[in-house]
Amino acid sequence: MKVLHFYKTFGPEQFGGVEMFIRHLTHATSDLGCENTVLSLADEPLPPQQTPSVRMFQARQNFNVASTGFSWSVFADFARLAQEADVIHYHFPWPFMDLVHLAKGLNKPSVVTYHSDIVRQKVLLQVYRPLMHAFLGRVDAIAATSPNYLQSSSVLRRYRHKAQSIPIGLDQSLYPVADAEQVEQLRDRYGGRFFLFVGVQRYYKGLHFLLKAMQSAPWPLLIVGVGPMEQELMRMAERLQLSNVHFLGRVDEQEKINLMQACYSVVFPSHLRSEAFGIGLLEGAMLGKPLICCEIGTGTSFINQHASTGIVVPPMDADALHRAMKTLWDDPALAQRYGEAARARYLDVFTAQGLGQAYSALYREVVSRPSA
C-alpha cells in the first residue's frame, strides 16, 4: 500500500504536534507494509530524503498568510506523487491543501486526519468555509483524533456518515531513554519534586492562568518550550514575583525525556479548542505521570480521565488549577495511583501500534471501495 501524506510542514528537525503524529504514524504503518511518502513545504527545501519508514519531499514555499503556506511548484509535485500512490492522506487544517486536492486530487482514494477546528481566524473562516466544505465533502473518510473532538466539532457534525475517531498513538521506542543520573540531578536541582509543562507557548495554551495559579504556591513549576507568548509570560512571571517558576526554553528530545521522567506531574492548562489533543500530555501519560488539564471538549480530557489518571478542571480558572496542583502535591500516594493509571491508559489506548493498525485498516477500506 503506497500512501502519500500531505501537510504544510514536515522535516527531520520538526517536532510540532502534527509533525510528530505523522512521524509516529508512518513508522507504525511501515511495519505493516505501507510505503509512506510525505510532501510538505519549506522556505529552503531540502533534497528528497529516505528513512526506513518514509520518503520526504519538500516544495518551495512562496509565501505564508495566516499560518497558511502557499507554493506554486507543489501542484506539479503533488500530481506526480499522487499518481504513484494508492491513497492520499491529508492533514487538516491547511486551506491551501484543499485547493491542491480539488485541482490535482486525481480521484484517488483519500483520508483526512482532522486535527483541529479553525478557532482563531474567524473572519478568514467565513471566506474559507465554502472551500473547506468542498474539500471535506469530496474526501472518502475523515478521522478525528479523539471521540471528544468528533462529538464536539460543529464542522464534523455534517460528516458523521464518513467520520470516525482514531486516537493518536506514540511509539516509545522512538524516544531516547531517560538518563538516570541526569534525572536525579534535575530532582536535586529543583527540590525533589516539580510540576512540568512542555509545549509551544501559544495563545491557547492557558499559561497565563497557570502563572496566576502559581501565586503563593510552594511547589516549583518548570516551563519547557518557546513560542510567540514566551516573552510576555516571562514578564508576567517577573511581575508576579514567581521565583519558583523556571523557563527552560528550547530543549532537545533527550533533555525533554529526562525532565518528563524527573517531574512529579505534568500540567497542561490549554483553555481553547485550538488545543485539539495535547501530545505533551500524552507523553506524560506514557511515562506514568499524574496529569492535570482543562475540560475544553477535545482530546485533552480523553487522554486524562478525571479522578482516574489525574485531575480535569474548568478552563480559564487559575484557582481550580492551583487546587488541583495542591491536591497532588499534598497526596503523593494519590499522585502515584494516577500516574500508574495514566501509564496503563497509554498502553491500552494510545500506542502507535494501535494507531498504525487502525489507519492501515482505513486505507484498505477506502481503496477497496468501488470507483464512483
Positions of the model-derived regions?
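N-terminal strand-loop element at the rim of the active site
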Residues: 6-16, 20-69
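A conserved mid-protein helix/loop that constitutes part of the nucleotide-sugar donor-binding site
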Residues: 20, 193-216, 228-234, 319, ...
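Donor nucleotide-sugar binding/catalytic pocket of nucleotide-sugar-dependent glycosyltransferases
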Residues: 40, 132-181, 192, 247
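Acidic donor-binding loop of glycosyltransferase active sites
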Residues: 86, 195, 261-276, 289
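Short His-centered aromatic/hydrophobic patch
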Residues: 90-97
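Nucleotide-activated donor-binding/catalytic signature segment of Leloir-type glycosyltransferases, i.e.
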Residues: 234-254
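Short hydrophobic beta-strand element within catalytic cores of glycosyltransferases
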Residues: 286-294
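Conserved acidic donor-binding segment of nucleotide-sugar-dependent glycosyltransferases
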Residues: 305-318, 325-332
